């Protein structure tokens, strides 16, 4: 049987690859494996049209096992994480495909602390999903209840408002909510700092999430930041667990640069635990050089924010994240939260009295190119001699200062190629060559 769980839960095209039957089986499996007697599950969703369908299927599955389900409705993923950990819930299930296009959806399971599951528990859930019809359900008089509970969202909003209240700024901010769930609270929370906040792409219709907007398409935000004369712009993704920034000139500041800005600020204030920053293998070598030159250390993990958090917990680090914009600031949250990241950037800008462009300039990056290649047989790349030979040849041309990474995506049906080195032209050339060969060999 094909593996269901990727690096960020279960994903697929709604009602095609990912069906209500999967959500129903997941509801039953989660209730059986994670929910003890009297402990409910909480379910949230982003703004996709298919969200209601999947949430209803989860409810049907879990309640058939005698477990109550609290429905919080449309919320950011970090909100569901906070709600799950703050309440008496056995687990949380988020219906979201994050930055993916609207036809996709996904199912993320969180443990009682609001954290993503480790792979051992995921494997157990997967076996239960495939065999969910063999699970013994509750009797008719012991079925679980579906409980609408929108008030739970206030727990998250009030906590983030308390973080905002500790910042006093007059920055002019533009935030792109990706027509996703972050729009429910982002503007209100950022305005609590005293900032002048303009909100864009906050009109979800079920089909426009991440469509030409948000963290994966920051071009529209960049134009608006310049046109409005704003100090800084922030782009969330569809479930608001990541953020990409834009400086006053419209220049995109990615997750690596944001992490560098935050790490340098904390190193200077001696408030970076163990002087450590946890990043993925994709993070730019320039970030590593900058942090190490400032007296810090870099710890690298596999790609995926759950691995970032795992690395932070093991090492005692307080800051970690990915180039894609997931940033975890452990003193405030145990998950990536684009709104919290925006608050932290605003705080650093205000404290330093410097522009984001100036702050980011202190974190010079090596030329890096990434390609995403649709691949039907993406899991076969390691056994392909032509691909391995091409990787070795590219590494030889780059020399010791360069890197090549090829990996299957854990969230999309693509192979990802990353090439990094001091010569930008050579980096682009090699990335194109590897992308073309990989697409040819794996399709």
Predicted stretch roles:
Residues 38-46, 70, 172-174, 275-281, ...:
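Short glycine-rich phosphate-binding loop at a beta-alpha junction
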Residues 47-52, 100-101, 178-184, 240-241, ...:
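Gly/Ser/Thr-rich loops at beta-strand to alpha-helix junctions
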Residues 232, 269-443:
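Phosphate-binding and adjacent anionic-ligand microenvironments
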Residues 121-157, 162, 248-321, 327-329:
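Proline/glycine-rich low-complexity loops and linkers
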Residues 13, 105-228:
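Gly/Ser/Thr-enriched, mixed-charge loops and adjacent short helices
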Residues 8, 43, 80, 93, ...:
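Buried hydrophobic positions in well-ordered alpha/beta secondary-structure cores of metabolic enzymes
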Residues 1-65, 90-91, 146-173:
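An N-terminal, well-structured beta->alpha segment
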Residues 29-32, 40-104, 188-246:
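N-terminal small/polar loop signature for handling phosphorylated ligands or for N-terminal nucleophile
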